[in-house]
């Protein structure tokens, strides 16, 4: 692998069998698989000055390994994903835990047996927990919106408490919408856990942190003689879609294109922009992440050395996250797609414009306008690369 800032003089896209736009999970996975499986020469074009996408991490002045774009916690149920990523990193045994600061009391999130006892006291908390067990069984995740629909006064009491103190205000801060306006695929990610396990991902068999960090993982993944990486390159300056064809520097490009950027930006927002939420980061607590679910302006604080396992006496780095609406072409980072029927229809209109381009493959959270965990986007890229490989094997 060679990483270059900008495109060299005389760059010829036709020297490459595949162009990948974006050096995050989706792009890096596809680049690696096509290079090593069918011998594709691959050019990876990355708009930012670094690889690894939003998983990028670096050592700050205090020596703390910081996730620049907010905390990324690896977890998966998918054995194929885990085996693939494990080729490029060893893992530390990190089990992520999150606390919610509810009016000064720190409670485990997802809301669980321990949270019930803290919120309602020992006696009432146990009564409510038995009702949850009788209704749903132990070690079950129950989405908060499903719990609210139960016609039972005890379950309604739990639902109302969690909704008001853990879910409602945090959700409005993060998304700028009320829960009933938010797509169920998002609200379903906020469950009540009927059990005592206070890990954030209690049932995921594979979880941890890359031993040397995420950036090192990506460096290893992209380390291949047939892969060239060009940072500080905006693919929109050379790549266009016209009449069912991919043009690069105005000429038809016959190789494969894996595109992981926003589709609306590829077309200069000519049908309108797809809304996102973005985060401002403002760079001492018992766990890696504390969610502030009630009154504070920020959504959460992360203390990174609690996640990386670094021992740095007297030194720490925290990050506060403030969520607000994303402004396209402003230099902000689009984090969370605001998925609702209107936005979905707009995305489908953009997607239709590339659907007939057989060598153009949109993949990833931006290109698919989805809320993606790291393991899910990795799996999506593995499946896409399977399809491309099958056409060239």
Could you say what each language-model-derived stretch is?
Residues 1-14:
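A short, basic/flexible loop-to-alpha-helix module at the beginning of a structural domain
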């Amino acid at each position: 692998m060679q990483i270059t800032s900008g495109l060299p003089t005389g760059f010829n896209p036709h020297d490459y069998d595949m162009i990948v736009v974006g050096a995050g999970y989706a792009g890096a996975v596809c680049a690696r698989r096509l290079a090593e499986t069918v011998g594709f020469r691959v050019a990876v074009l990355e708009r930012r000055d670094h690889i690894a996408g939003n998983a990028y991490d670096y050592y700050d002045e205090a020596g703390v390994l910081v996730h620049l774009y907010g905390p990324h916690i690896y977890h998966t149920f998918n054995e194929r994903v885990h085996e693939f990523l494990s080729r490029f990193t060893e893992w530390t045994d990190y089990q992520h835990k999150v606390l919610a600061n509810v009016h000064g009391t720190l409670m485990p999130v997802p809301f669980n047996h321990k949270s019930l006892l803290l919120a309602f006291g020992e006696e009432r908390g146990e009564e409510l927990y038995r009702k949850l067990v009788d209704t749903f069984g132990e070690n079950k995740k129950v989405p908060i919106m499903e719990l609210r629909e139960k016609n039972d006064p005890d379950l309604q009491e739990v639902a109302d408490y969690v909704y008001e103190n853990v879910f409602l205000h945090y959700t409005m801060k993060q998304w700028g919408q009320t829960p009933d306006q938010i797509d169920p695929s998002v609200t379903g990610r906020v469950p009540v856990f009927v059990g005592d396990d206070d890990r954030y991902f209690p049932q995921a068999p594979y979880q941890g942190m890359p031993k040397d960090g995420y950036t090192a993982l990506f460096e290893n993944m992209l380390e291949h003689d047939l892969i060239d990486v060009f940072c500080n390159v905006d693919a929109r300056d050379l790549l266009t879609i016209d009449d069912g064809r991919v043009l690069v520097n105005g000429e038809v490009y016959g190789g494969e294109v894996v595109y992981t950027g926003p589709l609306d930006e590829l077309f200069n927002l000519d049908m309108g922009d797809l809304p996102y939420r973005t985060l401002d980061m403002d760079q001492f607590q018992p766990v890696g992440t504390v969610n502030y679910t009630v009154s504070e302006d920020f959504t959460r604080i992360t203390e990174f050395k609690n996640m990386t396992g670094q021992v740095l006496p007297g030194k720490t780095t925290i990050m506060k996250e403030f969520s607000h609406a994303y402004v396209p072409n402003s230099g902000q980072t689009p984090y969370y797609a605001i998925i609702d029927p209107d936005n979905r229809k707009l995305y489908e209109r953009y997607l239709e414009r590339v659907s007939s381009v057989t060598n153009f493959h949109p993949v990833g959270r931006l290109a698919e306008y989805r809320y993606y965990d790291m393991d899910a986007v990795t799996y999506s890229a593995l499946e896409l690369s399977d399809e491309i490989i099958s056409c060239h094997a």
